Amino acid sequence: MSVYHLPTLLNPLVNAIFNCPEPERSPLKKLFANLKTRRFILLAPPSEYLLNYHDVKSKLPLHDLCYNAEFINSYILLMTENSYINTNSRDSHYETLDGKTVVIQWKNNVIHALNGFHIRRRLKILETKILPNFNDYFEGAADFIILFIDQPLNCEFVPNDYLQCFHNYEKIPKNAHAMPNLSIDSFQQERSSFENILHIHPARLTQLGQLFSSYRTLAPGDDPSRSIFESIVQQAFDGMKSDSLFKNFSNLYDLIHDYFELNLYDDIWSRLTTHFKGHEVDTEKYKYFSVNQLLTDFYSKDYGEFELHDITLIERRLHLASKHLQKLALTHSYAEKSKILVETLQKLSGTTEMDSHQLELPDGLNNMTMDADTLISLFVLVVCRSEQKHLKSHLYYLQNFSNNSSSTKFGILGYAVSTLEAVVCYFEDFNKNTGNVAKANTLCEKTKNLLDKLSCENPTNEVEDLATYKDILTYRNEQGQSILSICITNHKNYILLDILSEYETDFPVEDLLEDETIDGSTLLIESIKAGNLEAAKVLIKIMLFNCTEEELVSYINKTDKYARTVAHYLTHEMDILKSIGNYIDWKRKNSSGQTPLFSIFRSYDQPNYEEMVKTAFDIANTWYRKHNSLFDYLDHTDNKGNSLLHVLKTNIPILLQLTKLDINEENYKGLTPLMVYVKYKRLSNIDAITKDRRLILEKVQNSTFFTCFDYAKDHSVLSKIGERGVKDSLFGLIYFHSLRYHNLNATTNITSVSNAEKPFATTVINMKTIQGLLRSILKDNPFTFLPLNTYIDEISHLNRSDLTIIGKTDVTSLLHQLTNCFNVLLFLKKIPENLFTDEASILYWMRINTSKRNQKPSGKENPKTMEPEEINMIQSFLRFNFDEISSFKASLNILRKVLIFINLKSDDFEDAYKGLNEMGRKLINSEASSAFKGIITNHNMFSELSLAELLENVRFLEQCTIQLSSFVQIILFEKIPNWWKHYGEFLALHKSYRKAFPNMVKPKSASDTSSRAPLGGFIETKREQSEQRLAVQIKASSKMLKELGSEIFVAHERLAEELSNYMEFRKACLDQRSLVAFATTNISVLQECV
C-alpha cells in the first residue's frame, strides 16, 4: 500500500480514522482491516471537545483517545441492509463496532446511546456530512456519512487545565438540562421541617384540627372574628413552645400562624365577603375614568412644561399595575396579598424592577417620580381597570390578619395598606355624588356618551356638536388610546378633522408626535393597522408640513411592543410608502427579526404585489445610498434565517441583480430559496433563479437530505428545474433526477435535450428499462470506458421504499453517475439524441438494436491469423497508451484528493476561527478579549459550487480511466503474453517436426494418411505415428494462435476506437467542462469578494 501524506484534519477522530498515512503500521491497523470492505457511519463529537477536554477516568486528553481502538469503536456504526429502510417507528437501530446499541431518530436529529454504554446519553445531531473517500485502505464505499454530535459519548469529560485563563469555559450541551442551584432561606426550611413533624405526629394534627373546628363553630357566619383566630393561634403556640419537638424553631409563632391561615383561609374569606356584601366598592360605573380627570396637575401645566410623553409613560405603568393587581383575587394568605399590593404600587411608581414587559419600555418610565396624591389618583385608575372585586375585604384582611400588627403600620407595606385604604375612601366619596365628585360623575357619563357615538355605525347616532364634548377631548382609555386614536380606529375621520382643525391648541403637533397607546402604537401606526388610509394621509400631511426631518425620522421609526415601526405594517399602501419611504429606517428589525422591506416582501395578499415590492426595494436602495452605503442583503434576514429571496413571491430579478448575494443560502430549517419556490410552486421565481449561474441546483437540506426535487410535486416544476440540471450536466444533454417508488418499482424523471417544438423534454422512465438499456449498450460496446456494469448492479438494489438519509445519498450518487454516463453516450453518439422522448422509444430502440446485433456474423467463424510483427505493433501501441493512462490516472487521483482537502480544510479553517473567537470572548482579560473582535478572515477562496462540480467530474473521469486501464491491462499483460507463449510453443513444435522429418514439406493431416493406406492404422510404423502426433499438435497450436490473435485483433480495434472516444471525452470533460468552468466561476466569486 502506498504511503501518502495529506494535511491533518482539525477533528482528531475524523483524522485518525480516514487520514492515516501508514495504515499498516498504525495502532489502528486491526480496525482498518476490519472496516476495509464495510460501510459504516461515524459519530464525530465537536472538535472543541476533542481538542480541549480530557477523560475523567483515564486522565488522557480526548484527542489522544482518538487513536485508541477501544474508544473509537463506540463511534462507528455498522450498516446493514436495514440501514436503508425507514421503519414505521421512524427509528433506526444500529450496532457499534464493539456491539453497543444506538438508536437514531432521523426526523428529530436525535441519537440515543442505549445498551452497552455505561453512560446513556441523548445526543443531538448538529450536522450531517458526506465525506468522499480519499484514502486507499477503505474500499467499502466511495462516500462515508459523518454525523457530528453535540458531545462525546461513553466517557466523562472535563476541560483541560490550560483553559483556566478563560472565564466560565465549560459549556452545557444543548440537550442537557442544568439543575438550578436554588438557595432556600432559613424560614422556608423551617416551614418544611415544621410541616413534616406535624405529619409524623398525628396526635398534634388532631389537636390542631380541634382548634380549626373551634374557630368554625365560634366565629359567626358574617364576622371573620379576628380575636378568635388570634386566640386559637396563641393557644396552639402555648402548647407547642415547651415541646422538645419544636424547641429549635426560631420563628415558631409565625409558623403556627401561617399554618392556621392556610387551613382556615376559606372560612375567613367567606365570612369577610358576607360581612361586606352590599357595601363593597363597585368599580363598574367608574370604568370611564381617565388620566386627564385624575391627574389635573399634569394637564394644568404650562404649554412649555406639559409633555404628552409623560402621560403615555403613566398609561403604561397603569396597564402593568392593573394586570398585576388582578392577581390579588388568586391570593390565599396575608403574605401573598401584601406582596401583590406592594409590587403593584412599585410598578405604578416605577421604583423597582418590573416584569419582562417593562424592560421594553423607555428609560424615562423608571426615572419619573410622583407624589403621594398622584399615586393615590393613579391607584384609583388601577383599581377601576383591574375590575377588582371585594376591595374592602382585601383591605380588612391586610389590616387584621398579619402575624405582626406593626408591619401594616410602618414601612413600605404600611404605606401600601394606607394607600389602599385611601383609595377605598375615595370611592366612598364618589358614591356620595357631591361637589367635585358630582362633576367627575358627569364627565364619566359624558365620556360614555361620546365613546358610544364614536363606536356606533348608525348615522342617526353621530356627534352633532363637538363643542359640547370639549372638556373631555383629552380622554384616554385603558389601552392608552386618545380620542384621536379612537376616531382613527373607528374611521370617524370627519370628527378627526374637526378636532385637528378646531382644537389645534389642545392637540399641537408635539402631542401628535407623542400620542401612543400602551403597546407603543403611534397615531400613524393605528391608522395603518385599522386600514384608515385617509387618516394616515392627513397625519402624514401634517407631519411633513410641520416637522423637521429629524422629527420625521424619529416619529416614523417609533416602535410598538413588537418592535414594529409603521413601515412594518405597510402592505399595499403605495402612496403612503412613497411619501414616507425616505424617512424609514430600512434596517430596523421587529421582534421576529424582520425589516420593513422583509415585511412588505412577505405580504402576499396585496393586489399590486409586484409594484409594491419594486417600489419598496427602490426606495430602500435610495435610502442606503443616502446613508453612503450599498444595499446590504444580509441586513434583511429574520430570526428563522429566512432571507429576502426566501420570502419573495414574484419578481426576484430585482434581487438577482445584486452582486454580493448568496442565492443558495439556507434558512434554519435548511431550505434554500429554490426549495421554497418549488415547495410553493412559484414558477416565475423558479424560472428566474434557474437561469442564474450562481445557483447550486442540488443543494442538500441538512436535516432531511432532501434536494429541491424532493419538494417538487408538479410536472411543470420538475421540468423547469430539470432544464437547469441538463445545462449543468457534463455535456448539457441529459439529466436524471427525482427517483420515485411505485409498488416497489423505481422510476426516475429524465430531462433531456429535445428536437421537438420545446428545447427540453421531461419523461418518467422505469429504472428497469434504464438497466436494460445499459445492458444493451454494454453488449454493443464491451470495451467501453464507462463503468456500465457498476451502474447495472446498483440499479438492481433500488427496490427499497422510504429511504433513510443513507439510502438517499446512494440514490443521489447513482443518479449523478447515470447523468454523466448518458451525457457521454449522447456526446459520442452511441445512442440517438431523441431516445428519451418516452419509455416506448427506449424499448423500441433496444429491440431494433438486439436484432441488428444478432444479424452480425461472429468473428469466431473466420479467425484472423496474426503475425508477430502485428502483435508487436499492437503491444507497443497498448503499452504506450497504458503508460499514458496510468500517468493520467495517478494525476487524477492526486487532483481528487486535493479537491477533497480544499473543501475539508476550508471547513476546518471556519471551525477553528469560530472556536478561536468563542474562546477569545471568554478571556478574563477584557483587553485581550476585545482584540478578538477585530479578526477578519476570508476562507471562501473557492466557490462551493465550482468545487463540487469539479470534484464530481474528476471522480467520474477517474472511474472511466480506471475502467479503460483495466481493459488495456488485460490485453497487454494477459492476452498478448498468452499469445507469445502459444507462439513459442508453436515454433517449438515446428522445429521438432522439421528435425524429425526433414524431408516432409509440411505436416500431414490425418485424412492424407488414411487415404493412402486403408489398413494403415494397423500397419503404420512408429515413425508415421510420431509424425501424425506432431501434426495434430501443430494444428491445435495453430488454431489456438488464430483464436488468440483474432481475439487480440478485435480487442485492439475496439480498444483503439474506445481510446479515441476516451481522448475526445477526456479533453472535452476536463478542459472545457471542468477546468474552464471552475476557473470562470471562481473568478466571479473573487470579484464579488473584492
Swiss-Prot record:
GO terms for biological process: early endosome to late endosome transport. Residues 289-436 form the VPS9 domain. GO terms for molecular function: guanyl-nucleotide exchange factor activity; SNARE binding. PROSITE patterns: VPS9. One of its GO terms (cellular component) is tubular endosome. InterPro entries: Ankyrin_rpt-contain_sf (IPR036770), UPF0507/Ank_repeat_27 (IPR051248), VPS9 (IPR003123), VPS9_dom_sf (IPR037191). PANTHER family: ANKYRIN REPEAT DOMAIN-CONTAINING PROTEIN 27, DOMAIN PROTEIN, PUTATIVE (AFU_ORTHOLOGUE AFUA_1G09870)-RELATED. Belongs to the UPF0507 family. This is UPF0507 protein SCRG_01893. The lineage of its organism: Eukaryota, Fungi, Dikarya, Ascomycota, Saccharomycotina.
